[in-house]
Curated annotation (Swiss-Prot):
NCBIfam families: hmgA. InterPro entries: HgmA_C, HgmA_N, Homogentis_dOase, Homogentis_dOase_bac, RmlC-like_jellyroll, RmlC_Cupin_sf. Pathway: Amino-acid degradation; L-phenylalanine degradation; acetoacetate and fumarate from L-phenylalanine: step 4/6. Hexamer; dimer of trimers. The keyword Iron applies. This is Homogentisate 1,2-dioxygenase. GO terms for cellular component: cytoplasm. GO terms for biological process: L-phenylalanine catabolic process; tyrosine catabolic process.
Length: 441
């Protein structure tokens, strides 16, 4: 699966790659005649005038420009959209079992299923959270998203994502990011695939600042991989599908748009193996805030507050003394959508299965279930807790995640989720009255 020669390493680097020698111009971007009869095309991911450290763009040298295709027409469908509803959002904690695998041939695009979201692509803020379940590769069709960049989190099955700028191979416990506007095709390397997608309408994903952690730790830049140039030259009757302003559109295209022979720049797909995350934790007491598990962050216009954080809860050792070691009970001004790629999440002993999901919106109380609380409260703290064979994650957003109607009414929603806390009984033992200073009456 890991083929280093197909990838270039580093996060946000200025890359240059060509599949045919001599295709990249030297010393300029747009020569009068590009080598080999190619076309020069710039793909901009930020404003031209964005600060240099945040500016993202790539120059593509391709067989045909991206403008060559037929007229778009609307695709009537109801599973993938930005309709997060104008009605009341229930403050309930919510949990879903895994999205069922399809019974009929379904590719990646047709298998996308919108769960929740906030903001909008036209405002360039917020996110949408989707699931996907597929059992077929994309044949004769290509997809791009004009609304946001896509963070793919496979849970079941390997994917081969063929993009304009090269090929990403993904397996569970890896993630892939497809920039806004990049065209791609998803091929299944196994009989079925399922996973999660965060569609980021806001600021481009980046590595979080490390502060006092120092120069190293969490997700290290060298572990991110960007594909080398790869192209195909195919003519035929194909379909180009676009997500634009919350709707799917289709156009006829008489060639494969994956025809970029060479490119240079810093706006490109990339992948990261979550097993390489350098986990930080307490070696004295207490459980630190979960921000220490942040892999990538999308900034907002409020300093210190993210549009979206992507955090993981990977294998780790818990050694804190005099401490309740699992994640504590919590009410959060942010909203948390969680998924499980592999194993068991250490705050939920039962009910949260790989492929499942939970949503704890702003100020909705959540935390370990009764079984986990009882076990951790009696644990022998002279021994470390080795949390192994797990990979949970969270999309955390500053704005409330509004669940879609299909998510609220889904057959795989767990109607009894709140019961996981029903066993948490009052154990308070009232001290003598002389030790009580104030009691509400």
């Amino acid at each position: 699966m890991h083929n280093p020669q197909h990838y270039m390493t580093g996060f946000g680097n200025e890359f240059a790659t060509e599949a045919v020698a001599g295709s990249l111009p030297v010393g300029q971007n747009s020569p009068q005649r590009v080598a080999h009869g190619l076309y020069a095309e710039q793909l901009s991911g930020t404003a031209f005038t964005a600060p240099r450290g945040e500016n993202r763009r790539s120059w593509l040298y391709r067989i045909r420009p991206a403008a060559v295709h037929g007229r778009f027409s609307l695709i009537e469908q109801s599973r993938l959209h930005n309709d997060f509803g104008g009605g009341p959002v229930p403050p309930d904690q919510m949990r879903w079992s895994p999205l069922p695998l399809p019974a009929t041939p379904t590719d990646f695009v047709d298998g996308l299923y919108t769960m929740a979201g906030n903001g909008s692509p036209e405002a360039m803020t917020g996110v949408a959270v989707h699931l996907y379940a597929a059992n077929a590769s994309m044949h004769g069709r290509f997809f791009y998203n004009a609304d946001g960049e896509l963070l793919l989190v496979p849970q079941l099955g390997r994917l081969r994502v063929c993009t304009e700028l090269g090929v990403l191979e993904l397996e569970p416990q890896q993630i892939g990011v497809i920039p806004r506007g990049v065209r791609f095709r998803v091929e299944l390397l196994d009989s079925a695939a399922r996973g999660y997608v965060c569609e980021n309408f806001g600021g481009l994903l980046r590595l979080p600042d490390l502060g006092p952690i120092g120069a190293n730790g969490l997700a290290n830049p060298r572990d991110f991989e960007t594909p080398r140039a790869a192209f195909e030259q195919r003519d035929g009757a194909f379909e180009l599908v676009a997500k634009f302003q919350g709707h799917l559109w289709r156009a006829d295209i008489d060639h494969s748009p994956l025809d970029v022979v060479a490119w240079h720049g810093n706006y490109a797909p990339y992948r990261y193996d979550l097993r390489r995350f350098n986990t930080i934790g307490s070696i004295s007491f207490d459980h630190p805030d979960p921000s220490i598990f942040t892999v990538l962050t999308s900034p907002s216009d409020t300093h210190g507050t993210a549009n979206m954080d992507f955090a993981i809860f990977p294998p780790r050792w818990l050694v804190a003394q005099h401490t309740f070691r699992p994640p504590w009970f919590h009410r959060n001004v942010a909203s948390e959508f969680m998924g499980l790629v592999h194993g068991v999440y250490d705050a939920k002993a039962e009910g949260f299965a790989p492929g499942g999901a939970s949503l704890h919106n702003c100020m909705s109380g959540h935390g370990p279930d009764a079984a986990t609380f009882d076990k951790a409260s009696q644990a022998d703290l002279t021994r470390p807790d080795v949390i192994a064979e797990t990979m949970a994650f969270m999309f955390e957003t500053r704005a409330v995640l509004r669940p879609t109607q299909q998510a609220l009414s889904a057959a795989h929603r767990q109607a009894d989720y709140q019961q996981c806390w029903s066993g948490l009984r009052a154990a308070f033992q009232h001290p003598p009255a002389k030790n009580t200073t104030s009691v509400l009456r």
